[in-house]
Structure formats: structure tokens, C-alpha cells
Amino acid sequence: MTSMTATNAQPFTIVNVPEMRRVQRIHFVGIGGAGMAGIAEVLLNQGYQISGSDIAENANTERLRCLGATVVLGHMANNIEGASVVVVSSAIKADNAELVAAHQLRVPVVRRAEMLAELMRFRHGIAVAGTHGKTTTTSLVASIFAEAGRDPTFVIGGLLNSAGSNARLGNSKYLIAEADESDASFLHLQPMVAIVTNIEADHMDTYEGDFNKLLDTYVEFLHNLPFYGLAVMCVDDPVVSDLIPRLGRQTMTYGFSEAADVRAIDYKQTASESCFTILRKGLKPLDVCLNLPGKHNVLNALAAVAVATDEGINDEAIKSALNKFEGIGRRFQHYGNFAISDKDSNKEPGEVMLVDDYGHHPSEVAATIQAAREGWPERRLVMAFQPHRYSRTRDLYEDFVNVLSQVDVLLMLEVYSAGETPVSGADSRSLCRSIRQRGQIDPVYVATVDDMPEVLESVLAPGDLLLTQGAGNIGALAKRIATEVLSHES
């Protein structure tokens, strides 16, 4: 296990932002969100009074409460009384009672990314941007830096299993964080190092449906780097590669491509482990094994290795951190193998492998399917999928049809709206019809998450790999399946 408490960290005096001396209590509207909770935890550990509200309890709210934060359920105007500043995410609507009250009381209101930018202002910021892979890449950078004794502060969009949290206040100069392009709020950040993993059309409502506006915003983000900063770019992604001539900043590239400055060769996946050799200019080849499956995770690791190499971290720390990496919650999270008997035959009892994954964009789903196929080619792949947002389903409809047709058995939940109004023809029944017309598989529509365990009992057979996939409330399904459907671990 990579310890997140380093004993030989570089000397660094943690100071609160001097101009924030007037701030005593910081209130978070929607404190249970991963990004919000992470920043709240760092500020709490810096000595600020933290309060917050959300509409439901989750692991983040429970953890923050245990750490000393005041967390209440429900958004009410009186929740912000006594707050010096109110922090909101882009998910909070303008008519939110607490937001309205803050404006009436002239309490400063800042976006989540603005507060993250303040934390980064007096540190060596490493920001990870891109459509996919941000959480895993950020986690890998943090793990390598911790293994090397650099004791970083980090704010991650998922639970880093080795730390038991998605955030930590370190004692060094380093702050490692995700940079969120979904609402263009990453423009607030001014890091020393920026990683761009890939760029695809997603969250296009923010960019008025104009892909060029999305690209221009990425360039603007990278121009926030100082002239002595570093842009770490995935050369395997053609869109990212095409941006490099526009940057006017020092760059380091990574990928499987021969053109990459940090390159992977001789890749081989065995179950959940990916082994490969890293080539870097002027350095000896480095043979590593990453405790994550799939080529997409190799790319994430290469980005982390590029940053670590630039910071002078030794190869032994890099190799050790990748090998011991314990993963992130809901990123190809392996729940285990569970005993199951075949109810419809006289076959011997077998087992089902259960994996949960957060991926909800067609490219992410495709990468997860590929990793499952390469690691466990003999298993029948059963996917329980929940589309996320009607707008994404509408905009990427044919891509979803193509990728979801690649599994052996598909159980489809209704679209998780995330507050959006339903869009005609972009619902799960429509997706099922379109997939069925392809003639490859016959998807099963499942109305609610509560109905899924019963459906699975009738579908699963010994030897299956069950993959629960999506970003909505399907996230709680894997644990429930493990206890209600697959109760005996083998």
C-alpha cells in the first residue's frame, strides 16, 4: 500500500492564503459532491470552520462530519448564517435558497474552481484536464509523489483507496488536482504543470455546441501556465496533438506513439494487471507493472510518469507506486468473485466476477469493455448500464448504440437525468430498440435500480463477468448485488 503520509517530504510551510485572514467559516452548497467535499476537507485541515448542506447523505458527508464539519440535509436560507463565504458548484441553480440568501446578505459567493485556485495560488500546482481519465491520472500522480516522499496535497474526483479519501492536506509545496472543463471553470486555475489526457465532444451545452470553442478554452487554460511551466500532452489523441503548436509553452508528450517523449512499448494485460516498458529520452528503459487493466490506464500512468520524471522522482518510486496502486472507487472496481449455481441446468456451481465502473461516455464504456475482454476473454460479459443525462444520450446516441452492442448481455436502466428534462428519442427504451435492430444482442429494459437484482438473478450464469456501468444512482448497485444476489464470495 502506498502510504499517503511521507516522512521525508521536502520542507514547506503550509500557510493559509494571507488575503483569506478575514474568512472564518466557509459554507459549501452541495458539500457531498466529490469535488466539493475534497476542497472542504483540505480547508478543514487548514483550520477553517466548514459547514455545508446537501440533499442526501453519502460517504463524503459522513466523513466530513466526523472530521468536524457541520453538515445539514436540505438547502435552507438560514444554513448560511454566519458564513464568511459561500462555495457553490455548477450544479447549484440560481434560485437555490442558500444562494439567494447569500446574495441578499452580501456574502461572497465563489465557484468551486475559484476556491481550488486559491488553494493552488501559493503551491506548485499540477492540474489534470481532459474528457476522460482525470480522476485516475490525478490519483496516479498523487500516489507516485507520495511514494517518493513528496507528501502532496491532493483533491480528486473519486475515492483514492490507499488514502481512504478523495482529498488530503500534505506538508509539501505540491497540490495535485483535477481541472474541470465541464463548465469551463478550469480557467480559474493557474498551475505550474498541466496534463491534458484527451479531448472529445462532451458537456457541449457549455460551449454552445461549438467544438472549436471547446478547443479554444483548452488553449486558454494551458496559457494560464507560466512561461516556465509545462504542458503534458497525450500525443496519441489527435485532437490534443493538434493543439500543441498553439500553446507557446514547453511541452512533454506521452503515449504509445513513436513520437512520444514518454512512450509505452511491449504492453501486456493479465487479468487486472498491465505490464509494459517505458521509454524516455536520455533515460534507461523502465519495466513496470500497473495494478490497473487496459491501455487507457497505461496512458494515464504515462502522464503521471512524465510529471514525476520532470520533477526528478526516481524510477524505483515510480515503479513501486504503479505496482502497489490500489485503485479508485468506481473505476473498474473489482468487488470479487461470488459463488453461483446454474438454476436451469445440472451444471456444477461456478462463480461470477463483479466489477463496477463510473464510465458514462461511449469512449469510456468502450475502454472498460476492452479491458474486460482482454483480461478475462473466456467470460461472458453481462453489463448493467445506466445512461447519464438526456443531452449526452441525444448528442452521442449512435456512439452509445455502437459500443453497447459489443457486450454479450445488456440490461439497460432508464437515463439518469441529473436534473435534465427528458428528451424525446433519447431515452433508454429508444436505445434498446436501436440496439436490438442491429441484431447482435437483445437488450433488456429495466425500469428502476430496485428492479435490477431480481432481473440479474434470472440472467446470471456461472463464469459471467458482471459489469455495473454508469455515473448515476447505479453507483450503489454493485454493493447491493454483492449482498442480495451474489451473497457467497468464493
UniProtKB/Swiss-Prot annotation:
Q: Which GO terms describe its biological process?
A: cell division; cell wall organization; peptidoglycan biosynthetic process; regulation of cell shape
Reactions accelerated catalytically: UDP-N-acetyl-alpha-D-muramate + L-alanine + ATP = UDP-N-acetyl-alpha-D-muramoyl-L-alanine + ADP + phosphate + H(+)
Recorded GO terms, molecular function?
A: ATP binding; UDP-N-acetylmuramate-L-alanine ligase activity
Q: Which pathway does the UniProt entry assign to this protein?
A: Cell wall biogenesis; peptidoglycan biosynthesis
Any Gene Ontology CC annotation: cytoplasm
| Keywords on record | ATP-binding, Cell cycle, Cell division, Cell shape, Cell wall biogenesis/degradation, Cytoplasm, Ligase, Nucleotide-binding, Peptidoglycan synthesis
UniProt binding sites for ATP: G130, T131, H132, G133, K134, T135, T136
What InterPro entries has UniProt attached to this entry? Mur-like_cat_sf (IPR036565), Mur_ligase_C (IPR004101), Mur_ligase_C_dom_sf (IPR036615), Mur_ligase_cen (IPR013221), Mur_ligase_N (IPR000713), MurCDEF_pg_biosynth (IPR050061), UDP-N-AcMur_Ala_ligase_MurC (IPR005758)
List the subcellular locations.
Cytoplasm
Known EC number: 6.3.2.8
Name the domain of life.
Bacteria
What is the purpose of this protein?
Answer: Cell wall formation.
Q: What protein family does this chain belong to?
A: Belongs to the MurCDEF family.
Q: What is this protein called?
A: UDP-N-acetylmuramate--L-alanine ligase
* Organism expressing this protein natively: Idiomarina loihiensis (strain ATCC BAA-735 / DSM 15497 / L2-TR)
Lineage, please?
A: Bacteria, Pseudomonadati, Pseudomonadota, Gammaproteobacteria, Alteromonadales
Q: Which gene encodes it?
A: murC
